[in-house]
Every structure is written in C-alpha cells, then in structure tokens.
C-alpha cells in the first residue's frame, strides 16, 4: 500500500506451484554466483509480484508480514533482491517463526544478502526510530514506518503466531483512516483471538478499508478451534492398531504437528520426519516454539545422498520397525505431485501405466532413489490438510485416493481443522470493524464474489466492494 510517496508491503507470497518450480531451479548447480545470477528466468517471479511493475521501488519502506506460511512470505527474498538493485534496504517486520523461515528461504534460493529483521513479538527489541507514539490499543505491537503506524492484531490460524495488520494513516482534519489487512484468520473466542473488543474500538475510531481473505466464504457457520484436532486424533487413533501410520501434512502447521506429537507419545511411538523440507521447517518451528514442539523425533531422508549421522534413508526403514514411528511427510495441501508424500505413494502403490495416470507415475529416478515404504492393509494413511479447491488439486486428490486404494491401506482424509474462518467468522469481523470499503484476496473470482453475496449483503450499511480482476490491479482510496 502506498501513501504520500511511501510504500509498505503487506505480505508477499508465492503460489505453491510457482514455489516448487523455483525450489527445483534453485537446487540446480548451474549458477554463476559471480554475476549474481539466481534464476534463469526471473520473469516467473516478476509476473507473480505485480508490485515490481506498479510501484516505484524506491518508495518501499518495509515489509510487514502476518505469519510464516509460504503463500504469505515466499516472494519476499525475490522482491528484496529487486529492491536492492534500486538501492533500497527495506527491513522486514514479522513473527519469530517467519524470521527463522525466511532466513532458510534466502538460503534455499541462494540469495546471500539478508534484510534487517524485526520481531513483532518483543517491542523492547524494536529500534527507537520505529517506535510508535500511539497510546491507544496498549495490547498491540506497534511500529512507526514512515507515515504509517502499523499494528499487529493477534488472530487464530493454523499456526500459533498469526496476525491481522491494522495500518493507521496520518490524520487529515477530523478524518482518521485505517487499512485493516485480515491475513489468514478465524475466530477463537476460547483464546480471545482476535481480541474483538480491540477490533471494535479500531472500527469506531477510524474509517476503515478492509482487505479480507476469502478461503472459507463458501461454508456456513464458524470454524472449529485448534484444540479439536487433538480430540479428533485421540478419538480415532487410540484403539486403532495399525503397523504404519503415515500422515500427509503441511510442515508449518504447528498446532496440527503438536497434536500428532501428543498422539505419538500416547501410542508409544516417535515422530518420524520424512524429507529435508519437513525436517528444516520442523526444526525452525521447534526453535520458535520451544514449549510446544518438544517431542522425540527421528529424521528420514528421501535420497541416499542425504544420509548423514543421525539421519536414515527411508528405504532402509524395515517393516518390522514401522510401529516405532508416526511418520509426517510434507504434502502442502493437494496442489502438486512432487511433494515427499506423493513420492512415497508413487513408489509404494504404483498405478497402471496409462495416460489417465501419467501425471502421478514415478520416474525411473524416483523408483531407484526414493525411499520405498511397504504399505498395505495393516497400515493407515492420514490426510491432515486442506480440501482441494481447484480442478488441478481435485485431480491430484483423485490420484492420491487411487494410490491409497492400490496399497490397500486404510485412508482417513478428514483429520483436519481449517485455519480459515467461515461465513459467520467474516460477518462478526466486519460487524465489529464496520468497513467503508472491502477488497477481497485469495482464490478465484467466484470466491471473491461470494464474499459480497454471503457476507457484505448482510451488513448495514453495505460497504463498497472492490473486486480486483487481475493481478496488479490498484485501488485508489480518496473518497
């Protein structure tokens, strides 16, 4: 967002498909680091980051991030690299898990220059030049960045440290304006996240423009709290005697992983982290949440070349030892066929060699190098991840189900609590905030349209609705 020739960036993520393309390219060895060449086709990133086309990069003052998930932070290294070309060294304000994760991303993408990171969880560490003099809303972390006063409002999500951002604009006469960026959120009144009284106060004090997510806008009611995950696991797995327990899960969903840690302990098993990505993310999260993630774990890698002391190749795990572990493999929802979980299923339960299954067939390299598990009727495969919402993801899910059917393992696709609000969550947020303007983000145009139909249509007065039609569309808030 831009004001008075100053710009702050509210989150900067990559789509999962683009993310995986870039990771594969980053891991290739054909780089000329002396020329600063990172990716052979940087237009892939530029196309996904319209800010690089529509904003004068010299005006960027900072990145302000809501939480550490890839679709909110993974473009930051690339945008930061472009800023540096313009002589701009923008700091990053975010949570400690996001700091740990981003440092790893910079390393993964082989971008050597790091920005200055500022944690939004400890105001005492904030440099004086960024300390806001806003006495209101004492419970919120605040930073003064150029003309903006940015406040981090705690919300519930599928990670333990997630925030909405309230950005106060300079007062003009009697007019006080605020941009409220929801980030990914749901309401959890049990924990008081978000603090609705503070949001109500913000709405009463300011004329608000709301930038709102739309992932749960098709679903009636409210999303369940994270504690339900532990209850569902205990109810389902306690008396279920299975040899192998393989879980497909996103590696950054701390509450879910914590629930599986608790369950593993009750079953007398160790957590088995499958793959480099799951391991790196887990260990970063463990560092960020030392009082939460603390179970005993073992690392398994998908390739023999990554074996080192204390790390075992998955292919060397013997069936007689399956009962020792509860295996967690990276799935990143249903988007692609190249996650560690998909590699396991491709080799453990190959599908018929035909065009119908071509996308999910293992390559020769996967068949020879990937650690192959023996999966059968005495085992269970659990999907603890978001339901598919695009056609490609639905096809991917269909192939996954065929793999599991081919393996004859028990399949449980429903051990998941969404990290996103539903229609009632959105309505309660907007009733408290009373925005003048609403701009949707996330997903397809249909879902953004549903936000207007299912939520805004019930508000009095009805806010103005601006639905961006293409990436890079700008909205000028003047009235």
Could you say what each language-model-derived stretch is?
Residues 10, 156-163, 168-229, 336-376, ...:
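Active-site-proximal loop/helix segments of hydrolase catalytic cores
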Residues 11, 95, 182, 213, ...:
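Generic beta-strand/beta-sheet core signal
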Residues 108-112, 401-410:
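Short helix-loop-beta junction
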Residues 222-378, 382, 406-407, 425, ...:
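Hard-cation-handling environments
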Residues 411-479:
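Internal alpha/beta domain cores that form substrate/cofactor-binding pockets in large enzymes
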């Amino acid at each position: 967002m831009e004001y008075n020739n100053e710009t702050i960036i509210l989150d900067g993520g990559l789509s999962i498909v683009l993310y995986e393309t870039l990771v594969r390219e980053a891991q290739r060895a054909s780089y000329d680091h002396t020329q600063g060449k990172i990716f052979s086709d940087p237009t892939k990133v530029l196309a996904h980051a319209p800010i690089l086309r529509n904003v004068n990069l010299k005006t960027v003052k900072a990145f302000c991030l809501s939480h550490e998930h890839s679709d909110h932070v993974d473009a930051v290294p690339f945008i930061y690299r472009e800023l540096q070309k313009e002589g701009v060294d923008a700091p990053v304000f975010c949570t400690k898990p996001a700091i740990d994760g981003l440092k790893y991303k910079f390393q993964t993408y082989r971008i050597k220059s790091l920005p200055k990171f500022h944690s939004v969880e400890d105001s005492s560490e904030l440099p004086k030049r960024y300390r806001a003099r806003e006495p209101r809303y004492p419970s919120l972390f605040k930073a003064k960045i150029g003309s903006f006063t940015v406040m981090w409002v705690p919300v519930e999500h599928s990670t333990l440290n997630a925030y909405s951002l309230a950005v106060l604009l300079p007062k003009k006469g009697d007019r006080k304006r605020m941009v409220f960026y929801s980030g990914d959120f749901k309401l959890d009144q049990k924990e008081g996240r978000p603090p609705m009284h503070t949001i109500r106060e913000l709405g009463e004090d300011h004329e608000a423009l709301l930038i709102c997510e739309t992932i749960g806008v098709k679903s009636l009611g409210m999303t369940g709290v994270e504690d339900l995950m532990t209850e569902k696991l205990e109810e389902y797995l306690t008396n279920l005697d299975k040899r192998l327990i393989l879980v497909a899960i996103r590696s950054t969903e701390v509450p879910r992983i914590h629930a599986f840690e608790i369950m593993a302990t009750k079953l007398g098993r160790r957590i088995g982290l499958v793959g480099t990505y799951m391991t790196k993310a887990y260990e970063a999260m463990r560092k960020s949440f030392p009082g939460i993630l603390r179970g005993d774990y073992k690392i398994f890698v998908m390739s023999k070349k990554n074996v080192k002391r204390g790390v075992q190749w998955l292919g060397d795990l013997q069936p007689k030892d399956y009962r020792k572990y509860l295996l967690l493999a990276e799935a990143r929802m249903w988007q692609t066929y190249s996650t560690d979980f998909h590699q396991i299923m491709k080799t453990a339960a190959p599908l018929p060699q035909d065009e119908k299954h071509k996308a999910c067939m293992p390559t020769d390299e996967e068949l020879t190098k990937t650690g192959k598990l023996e999966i059968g009727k005495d085992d269970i495969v659990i999907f603890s991840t978001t339901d598919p919402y695009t056609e490609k993801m639905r096809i991917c899910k269909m192939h996954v189900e065929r793999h599991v059917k081919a393996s004859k393992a028990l399949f449980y696709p429903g051990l998941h609590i969404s990290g996103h609000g539903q229609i009632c969550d959105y309505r309660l947020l907007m009733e408290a905030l009373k925005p003048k303007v609403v701009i949707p983000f996330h997903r397809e145009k249909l879902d953004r349209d549903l936000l207007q139909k299912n939520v805004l249509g019930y508000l009095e007065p009805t806010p103005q609705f601006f639905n961006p039609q293409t990436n890079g569309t700008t909205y000028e808030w003047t009235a």
